[in-house]
Curated annotation (Swiss-Prot):
Keyword terms: Activator, Chromatin regulator, Cytoplasm, Differentiation, Growth regulation, Isopeptide bond, Nucleus, Phosphoprotein, Spermatogenesis, Transcription, Transcription regulation, Ubl conjugation
Consequences of knocking out this gene: Mice are viable but display growth retardation, homeotic transformations of the axis and sterility in both males and females. Male sterility is caused by defects in generation of elongating spermatids.
GO biological process: double-strand break repair via homologous recombination; negative regulation of gene expression, epigenetic; negative regulation of transcription by RNA polymerase II; positive regulation of DNA-templated transcription; positive regulation of double-strand break repair via homologous recombination; positive regulation of striated muscle cell differentiation; positive regulation of transcription by RNA polymerase II; regulation of apoptotic process
Residue stretches of biased makeup (Polar residues): 486-513
Molecular function GO terms recorded: chromatin-protein adaptor activity; enzyme-substrate adaptor activity
Residues found modified as Phosphoserine: 538
Species, as recorded: Mus musculus
Name recorded for this polypeptide: Enhancer of polycomb homolog 1
Organism lineage: Eukaryota, Metazoa, Chordata, Craniata, Vertebrata
Entry's localization field: Nucleus; Cytoplasm
PANTHER family: ENHANCER OF POLYCOMB (PTHR14898)
Its job: Component of the NuA4 histone acetyltransferase (HAT) complex, a multiprotein complex involved in transcriptional activation of select genes principally by acetylation of nucleosomal histones H4 and H2A. The NuA4 complex plays a direct role in repair of DNA double-strand breaks (DSBs) by promoting homologous recombination (HR). The NuA4 complex is also required for spermatid development by promoting acetylation of histones: histone acetylation is required for histone replacement during the transition from round to elongating spermatids.
Length: 813
């Protein structure tokens, strides 16, 4: 890195001088390292100061000792002390003054002169005292007047006599002394003055000049940039002002025509009064003989419905053109086109004027067509007929996609008294009422939270979208505790009879147990099960469980009189073992256990209702939930199919049930009657709104991931479990969370998934289902009734043999 070097530059007085603080200054050795191998640079001092011995000694010491800090010499002027001389001038006695800062009082005293006596002046004054009466202050005043009265050239003696009001002899002596001293002085004045800038500009580079004048810079005018935007604004302003002037002219002509019409009406009445035509017969004869005069301007045949998209045809039938007024004529006013924005403009509609064509002798169509404007307040459709202003078009958030009417197109207004015929609306509102569009209570697993009522649909690109619906229980659903789903609590889900509408705020009376049992028996309750993609057959045990499940499903479809049930085994090798049937003794023990469980759950429900009566009274009125343990469900299924039937089916390849994150599956759903599936989808609690007015749909994209497959012979871990759920009809679902790898599947009766009646069901199975439905489950206020899998760290046990050890509740919601 090269060292810094300096070169002599011309001093610039306009350049500001830098001001350094003590901490900003570099060290002395950094200064010494700077190379000054340049010609003789002026030091900024006078030649006499440069030749002083203390400065020369400092420079020579630096050359001798080098750049060592210890040998540096700070140039300090020498001071001499003469105590005798000091004592002769100043008195020895010193008294502390009352104040250290003296301020001269405002009085009529003369100002003190700026000139100070020196030793030579003092010698001259002492010599002059012998001849004349003069004091040092008087001498200073005289010299001060002479210095201030003279500029570059000293004043003459005659001018000095005019300045000084003293004796001529004294003036002459002082003047001669002043002229002699002024000539010997190097400066222009004897009074030390601050050196100022000369007007001729010669002192620009003089470093001793202080208080320089400001550089007079010409203030240039900042011209406004005339760009295209400002030019367009001026054009718009001119257009608006011209339109206002034209409107005022039209109003003036309209009022003038009205006044003429009034005068003509008065003349007609006077003529009729003079003729005695009180009955109007003469007037009618004259009107009959009068030939209809064709209007000067053509009347456009444009229906009014074309001009407004907010008015229905029925509402505008009464606003047609009035034919009985013959004096009115319609004028064509096409909208003015601007070349900068070529747009497809609608055909200009006509606005009826209040004056006859004969009353407009000096009115030209050019003046009328120059600007688009409403002619009168008597025309309610004039604002609609006229096109939108450019400001509104520019501020339109849709931009180029904004709606614009096209010529020749007729737009019908929407029927506000009717709702849309959407598939999810009820048939009474004109919809299809399809069960595929039901709203269900939805719970996400990642992150684990309850969303409220939602429904799944496939969007663009196969993405699954959740449409959310508003309900009165949203505040409660959002704070549900998902870890307390096993505790029984009344559920408000049964309050909704229909679940095909997006608004679930309207509640109906809850169904009693008998009605629910009737619906179950008649299979009017349907179950929505989403299709899942087939997983790679990497495990032989997994493949065997799939084959067993498919064989059971086909057998159930082939026999219309009975349901099928798939049983679980303890390990993979025993997937094809025989089904264990219940004996009479086991059935009696099972009934006693069910009764004891029912009593315990009823007691817990009463305690929970008393504790939460103040906070969730409204939510507990219709919140009913029924439970059924897995063993009872398996027993009810075994009553419909023998153990020999479970082992006699052939194994074939088919689609099996899988798992999914948040219940997001790639394809649409399959509808089967009374189907048990071991899945972990999002909660689908089917609810029903009765009105579609206050609908709040919030679609949200759900990430689709492939879940793990839960099969008959697949061994689950402690962190993952399966949830078995049964959906009956529109708003009932049986959920069986289980820790054992069991798939309880009651398959549909045929391939078309048509619900059938339970005509061939034994009475014992129906009694068992009725007894199980009497149990009430507990659902806490901070949790949702859903099908989210709950972690169960229990060991795998047989589902049918060990009923008391591993009894899991099945929720009927």
């Amino acid at each position: 890195m090269s060292k810094l070097s300096f070169r002599a530059r011309a001093l610039d007085a306009s350049k500001p001088l830098p001001v350094f603080r003590c901490e900003d200054l570099p060290d002395l050795h950094e200064y010494a390292s700077i190379n000054r191998a340049v010609p003789q640079m002026p030091t900024g001092m006078e030649k006499e100061e440069e030749s002083e011995h203390h400065l020369q000694r400092a420079i020579s010491a630096q050359q001798v000792y080098g750049e060592k800090r210890d040998n540096m010499v700070i140039p300090v002027p020498e001071a001499e002390s003469n105590i005798a001389y000091y004592e002769s001038i100043y008195p020895g006695e010193f008294r502390m003054p009352k104040q250290l800062i003296h301020i001269q009082p405002f009085s009529l005293d003369a100002e003190q002169p700026d000139y100070d006596l020196d030793s030579e002046d003092e010698v001259f004054v002492n010599k002059l005292k012998k001849k004349m009466d003069i004091c040092p202050l008087q001498f200073e005043e005289m010299i001060d007047r002479l210095e201030k009265g003279s500029g570059q050239q000293p004043v003459s003696l005659q001018e000095a006599k005019l300045l000084l009001k003293e004796d001529d002899e004294l003036i002459r002596e002082v003047y001669e002394y002043w002229i002699k001293k002024r000539k010997t002085c190097r400066g222009s004045s004897l009074i030390p003055l601050v050196k100022q800038e000369k007007r001729d500009g010669s002192s620009t580079n003089d470093p001793y000049v202080a208080f320089r004048r400001r550089t007079e810079k010409m203030q240039t005018r900042k011209n406004r940039k005339n760009d295209e935007a400002s030019y367009e604004k001026m054009l718009k302003l001119r257009r608006d002002l011209s339109r206002a002037v034209t409107i005022l002219e039209m109003i003036k002509r309209r009022e003038k025509s009205k006044r003429e019409l009034l005068h003509l009406t008065l003349e007609i009445m006077e003529k009729r009064y003079n003729l005695g035509d009180y009955s109007g017969e003469i007037m009618s004869e004259v009107m009959a003989q009068r030939q209809p005069v064709k209007p000067t301007y053509a009347i456009p045949i444009i229906p009014i419905t074309n001009s407004s998209q907010f008015k229905h045809q029925d509402a505008t039938d009464s606003k047609e053109f009035k034919v009985n007024k013959q004096d009115k004529a319609d004028l064509i006013r096409p909208k003015r086109k601007y070349e900068k924005k070529p747009k497809v403009l609608p055909p200009s509609a006509a606005a009826p004027q209040q004056q006859s064509p004969a009353a407009l002798p000096g009115f030209s169509a050019k003046d009328l067509n120059q600007y688009d404007f409403p002619s009168s307040d008597e025309e309610p459709l004039s604002q609609v007929l006229s096109g939108s202003s450019e400001a509104e078009e520019e501020n339109d958030p849709d931009g180029p996609f904004a709606f614009r009417r096209k010529a020749g197109c007729q737009y019908y207004a929407p029927h506000l008294d009717q709702t849309g015929n959407w598939p999810w609306t009820s048939p009474k509102d004109g919809g299809l009422g399809d069960v595929r569009y039901r709203y269900c209570l939805t719970t996400l697993t990642v992150p684990q939270r309850c969303l409220g009522f939602a429904r799944r649909r496939v969007g663009r690109g196969g993405r699954v979208v959740l449409d959310r619906a508003h309900s009165d229980y949203d505040s409660m659903f959002h704070h549900l505790d998902l870890d307390m789903l096993s505790s029984p609590q009344p559920s408000p889900v049964n309050q909704f009879a229909n679940t095909s509408e997006p608004n679930t705020s309207d509640r109906s009376s809850s169904k009693d147990l008998s009605q629910i049992l009737v619906d179950i028996k008649s299979c009017r309750w349907r179950h929505f099960r989403p299709r899942t993609p087939s997983l790679p057959d990497s495990d032989s045990g997994e493949l065997s469980s799939r084959k067993l499940h498919r064989s059971i499903s086909r057998a159930g479809a082939a026999q219309p009189g009975a349901h099928t049930c798939s049983t679980s085994t303890q390990n993979r090798s025993s997937s094809g073992s025989a089904h264990c049937a219940f004996t009479a003794e086991q059935y009696q023990q099972h009934q006693q256990q069910l009764a004891l469980m029912q009593q315990q759950q009823l007691a817990q429900t009463q305690q929970q209702q008393q504790a939460n009566s103040s906070s969730s009274a409204a939510a507990q009125q219709g919140f009913v939930s029924k439970t059924l343990d897995s063993a009872s469900a398996q027993f009810a299924a075994s009553a419909l199919m023998t153990s020999e039937q479970l082992l006699g089916f052939k194994v074939k390849d088919d689609v099996v049930l899988g798992l999914g994150v948040n219940g997001v599956l790639p394809a649409s759903g399959v509808y089967k009657g009374l189907h048990l599936s071991s899945t972990t989808p999002t909660a689908l609690v089917h609810t029903s709104p009765s009105t579609a007015g206050s609908t709040l749909l919030q679609p949200s994209n759900i990430t689709q991931t492939s879940g793990s497959h839960s099969s008959l012979s697949h061994q689950v871990t402690a962190a993952s479990s399966a949830t078995t759920q049964v959906l009956f009809g529109n708003n009932i679902r049986l959920t069986v969370p289980s820790s054992v790898p069991t798939v309880n599947s009651v398959t549909p009766i045929n391939a078309r998934h048509i619900p059938r009646t339970l005509s061939a069901v034994p009475p014992s199975a129906l009694k068992l289902a009725a007894a199980a439905n009497c149990q009430v489950s507990k659902v806490p206020s901070s949790s949702s009734v859903d099908s989210v899998p709950r972690e169960n760290h229990e060991s795998e046990k047989p589902a049918l043999n060990n009923i008391a050890d591993n009894t899991v509740a099945m929720e009927v919601t």
